[in-house]
Amino acid sequence: MTQQLNVDPAEIKKFEDMASRWWDLEGEFKPLHQINPLRLNYVLENANGLFGKKVLDVGCGGGILAESMAKQGADVIGLDMGKEPLTVARLHALETGTKLEYVQSTAEQHAEENPETYDVVTCMEMLEHVPDPLSVIRSCAKMVKPGGHVFFSTLNRNIKSYLFAIVGAEQLLKLVPKGTHDHNKFIRPSELLKMLDQTALQERGITGLHYNPLTDTYSLGKNVDVNYIVHTTL
């Protein structure tokens, strides 16, 4: 009996259709380019650097975070189920001379083949796009080495996140395409922590990611009402 993949075909198609514009700094993925230095620095600071470490980026898309981690001297594999985003990621790595590998697979499949393999696992802006986020979290826990670091980022589910991420970002400011997110799939920090409790991962810190529409800039802070990042260790 074939195991059902933890994949939403509609989500895959959504990002396949936008793949060619992944590295357009003024396109649909501009917010990802803007927040990437913050995400990268958060990982660097909490994982004590990445140089020489084996790193997996789950749900890597077109490779924005994966490529930036490779440039820090990490041995990076980017994992995604979208064929077109991975094609774009590979081409961009060739253009920039960045050495890393991209694999088309689910977290679950990769975990079966690569247990306790990585020093650092990142899973950013991905959990809200799969049918079973707990399954992805369990897979990340399985793939990291004992003592290793796993980072998750997603969106909180409340009225404020609906107003900011759906009404504001998608409908008014048009920071991302309409339909990019489904508010019902957003994950409260308390829910994410309960999922972590079902694994061996230990939460080490949580921080919010904030957008200032007046300055068109992002920053990290204590408020986790909308976007947030969680640092865990095994």
UniProtKB/Swiss-Prot annotation:
Domain of life: Bacteria
Reactions catalysed: a 3-demethylubiquinol + S-adenosyl-L-methionine = a ubiquinol + S-adenosyl-L-homocysteine + H(+); a 3-(all-trans-polyprenyl)benzene-1,2-diol + S-adenosyl-L-methionine = a 2-methoxy-6-(all-trans-polyprenyl)phenol + S-adenosyl-L-homocysteine + H(+)
Residues that hold S-adenosyl-L-methionine according to the record: R39, G59, D80, M124
Pathway this chain belongs to: Cofactor biosynthesis; ubiquinone biosynthesis
CDD domains: AdoMet_MTases
UniProt-listed Enzyme Commission number(s): 2.1.1.222, 2.1.1.64
UniProt keywords, alphabetically: Methyltransferase, S-adenosyl-L-methionine, Transferase, Ubiquinone biosynthesis
Top-level class of the enzyme under EC nomenclature: transferase
GO biological process, one term: methylation
Pfam family, one: Methyltransf_23
Entries under InterPro entries matching the protein: SAM-dependent_MTases_sf, UbiG_MeTrfase
Function: O-methyltransferase that catalyzes the 2 O-methylation steps in the ubiquinone biosynthetic pathway.
Family: Belongs to the methyltransferase superfamily. UbiG/COQ3 family.
Name of protein: Ubiquinone biosynthesis O-methyltransferase
Biological source species: Aliivibrio fischeri (strain ATCC 700601 / ES114) (Vibrio fischeri)
